[in-house]
Swiss-Prot record:
The name this protein goes by in its record: Polypeptide N-acetylgalactosaminyltransferase 15
Residue ranges, Cytoplasmic side: 1-11
Cited SMART domains: RICIN
Lineage, highest ranks first: Eukaryota, Metazoa, Chordata, Craniata, Vertebrata
Taxonomic source organism: Homo sapiens (Human)
Binding site for substrate: D231, R260
Reactions accelerated catalytically: L-seryl-[protein] + UDP-N-acetyl-alpha-D-galactosamine = a 3-O-[N-acetyl-alpha-D-galactosaminyl]-L-seryl-[protein] + UDP + H(+); L-threonyl-[protein] + UDP-N-acetyl-alpha-D-galactosamine = a 3-O-[N-acetyl-alpha-D-galactosaminyl]-L-threonyl-[protein] + UDP + H(+)
């Protein structure tokens, strides 16, 4: 009986052992599939370091920034974060809304999280590095040269956004630097840089292409951080999706403003959060060459009062093709306070020690500019009362030159910039730019502001309607011991010094017969541009002309170009003060509306050929297409 009972219980024991064995296997599988959090984080971080494009840089940014603080309800206004002091005139409620939080503060931040915020966990990095692609590649998913030329619809900023979205976020630009630049080796002890990108409803592709271009071209030893400042964008893709994308990028921070600041004050917001030695303000639609940052840092390290800029190349807003600047140029201005590029004068070119020597520039371009962070703050930063954007580069340049600093363009630093379609600029932007120019004139030009108002009647009218309050900036000038604008004209840009009275006629040049206006529609270098007729537009600087007391017709911007004649076609050439060429640039504007070329005795006529409406010299016969009129300019002598 006992033996029979033993055999009866043996199958039960075997079943129990098998059950324990199966349970153990299940627990082992669960442990393998779901490791502890710290083990998983170490594994993912190791894989990301192995495969990420940034792994080749010399130093690490430190602990990765895994969290982005963001509003739970994107429709609500953001609230400021605590512990962040205000800067100049920006109130705290205008400042912060989202920052990348270091991993070391993650638990503390989670404990303080309020009901209106949430923490977004950093997604896993991709295991494979995104390949860099060249122009015109024909692989699947890439854009060939023929496809780049295919027309796409424009977005509100005049950008081919659909085409841009098809171009890789990481692509190699053609090498356009001077061979001597490639022989330069940066110092190991350069200052660090904070690159600040401000955007408002920027295209997703151009924004991130700018970010990746910086990360791919700058050694980590020199890049402290990239700070993205969202100036109240409304596009949904630039909200949570951007926060989550930025959380994957080491060294990239995201700030959000709860009010529309404009590019000028948004840059100031980014500057308050920057920790690098040097501030680099860059538009959010740029692409950088390798080695673009090191020359900027090196020049600032040699003199902390230098304001420096790279050579700005052109990325076509229609095709996204890259067009490098061929000749050395400097940034200048005219009496309407318009910025433009000018080929280096012969005496400046001869003074350069080499083709890669720094270029003294009267004005720095606004697209990319770098300066010492403490110098920027101690000299008053940007003018916080300027609206939106426009003219901030002039104010920065005048302040540098007149208050003990200098402005340079560095040929070995190259950055491509998308110059968006001018016609896409809103009337609000144009009004803000005009208002900013009035502030600059009242603050920095002194008695020469009268010359500005003579060249810009609309600015004169605005200054009479609303007198700007410039007391704070004038006090800043006295505190810094700044020089007068006369010193700038005598020592920095003597070519600008006014040498003649107000032009006899100015404004748009209307053709009576066709109802159109004289225009130059060339892109890029406009030297030799044939003059044509186009629909009249108050916003096109290319239609602003001046008939001077020397019988010249000056192109509005840049003003060093004049109407000339080549094979009886009216074109733009450099204004000439001596020699035979000057006679090709003399025009008599008669009371009957005809414009007579004095040397030939012929009249300027609008000639229609197929789809073109060009300007040619023809025998004077008084026909409607030879009748012209300039805009009427209100007198400003009573000021």
């Amino acid at each position: 009986m006992l033996l029979r009972k033993r055999y009866r219980h043996r199958p039960c024991r075997l079943q129990f052992l098998l059950l324990l064995l199966m349970l153990g296997c299940v627990l082992m599988m669960v442990a393998m599939l779901h490791p502890p959090h710290h083990t998983l984080h170490q594994t993912v971080t190791a894989q990301a370091s192995k495969h990420s494009p940034e792994a080749r840089y010399r130093l690490d940014f430190g602990e990765s920034q895994d969290w982005v603080l963001e509003a739970e309800d994107e429709g609500e206004e953001y609230s400021p974060l605590e512990g962040l002091p205000p800067f100049i005139s920006l109130r705290e409620d205008q400042l912060l809304v989202a920052v990348a939080l270091p991993q070391a503060r993650r638990n503390q931040s989670q404990g303080r999280r309020g009901g209106s915020y949430r923490l977004i966990k950093q997604p896993r990095r991709q295991d494979k590095e995104a390949p860099k692609r060249d122009w015109g590649a024909d692989e699947d998913g890439e854009v060939s040269e023929e496809e780049e030329l295919t027309p796409f619809s424009l977005d509100p900023r005049g950008l081919q956004e659909a085409l841009s979205a098809r171009i890789p976020l990481q692509r190699a630009l053609p090498e356009v630097r001077h061979p001597l630049c490639l022989q330069q080796h940066p110092q190991d002890s350069l200052p660090t840089a904070s690159v600040i990108l401000c955007f408002h409803d920027e295209a997703w592709s151009t924004l991130l292409r700018t970010v990746h271009s910086i990360l791919d071209t700058v050694p980590r030893a020199f890049l402290k951080e990239i700070i993205l400042v969202d100036d109240l964008s409304q596009q949904g893709q630039l909200k949570s999706a951007l926060s989550e994308y930025v959380a994957r990028l080491e060294g990239v921070k995201l700030l959000r403003s709860n009010k529309r600041l404009g590019a000028i004050r948004a840059r100031m917001l980014g500057a308050t959060r920057a920790t690098g030695d040097v501030l680099v303000f860059m538009d959010a639609h740029c692409e950088c060459h390798p080695g673009w940052l090191e020359p900027l840092l090196s020049r600032i390290a040699g003199d902390r009062s230098r304001v420096v800029s790279p050579v700005i190349d052109v990325i076509d807003w229609k095709t996204f093709q890259y067009y490098p600047s061929k000749d050395l140029q400097r940034g200048v201005l005219d009496w309407k306070l318009d910025f433009h590029w000018e080929p280096l004068p012969e005496h400046v070119r001869k003074a350069l020690q080499s083709p890669i020597s720094p270029i003294r520039s009267p004005v720095v371009p606004g697209e990319v500019v770098a300066m010492d962070r403490h110098y920027f703050q101690n000299t008053g930063a940007y003018d916080s009362l300027m609206s939106l954007r426009g003219g901030e580069n002039l104010e920065l340049s005048f302040k540098a030159w007149l208050c003990g600093g200098s402005v340079e363009i560095l040929p070995c630093s190259r950055v491509g910039h998308i110059y968006q379609n001018q016609d896409s600029h809103s009337p609000l932007d144009q009004e803000a730019t005009l208002r900013n120019r009035v502030r600059i004139a009242e603050t920095w030009l002194g008695s020469f502001k009268e010359t500005f108002y003579k060249h810009s009647p609309e600015a004169f009218s605005l200054s009479k309607a609303e007198k700007p309050d410039c007391m704070e900036r004038l006090q800043l000038q006295r505190r810094l011991g700044c020089r007068t604008f006369h010193w700038f004209l005598a020592n920095v840009y003597p070519e600008l010094y006014p040498s003649e009275p107000r032009p006899s006629f100015s404004g748009k040049l209307h053709n009576t017969g066709l109802g159109l206006c004289a225009d130059c529609q060339a892109e890029g270098d406009i030297l030799g541009c044939p003059m044509v007729l186009a629909p009249c537009s108050d916003s096109r600087q290319q239609q602003y002309l001046q008939h001077t007391s020397r019988k010249e017709i000056h192109f509005g911007s840049p003003q060093h170009l004049c109407f000339a004649v080549r094979q009886e076609q009216v074109i733009l050439q450099n204004c000439t003060e001596e020699g035979l060429a000057i006679h090709q640039q003399h025009w008599d504007f008669q009371e009957n509306g005809m414009i007579v070329h004095i040397l030939s005795g012929k009249c300027m006529e609008a000639v229609v050929q197929e789809n073109n409406k060009d300007l040619y010299l023809r025998p004077c016969d008084g026909k409607a297409r030879q009748q012209w009129r300039f805009d009427q300019i209100n007198a400003v002598d009573e000021r």
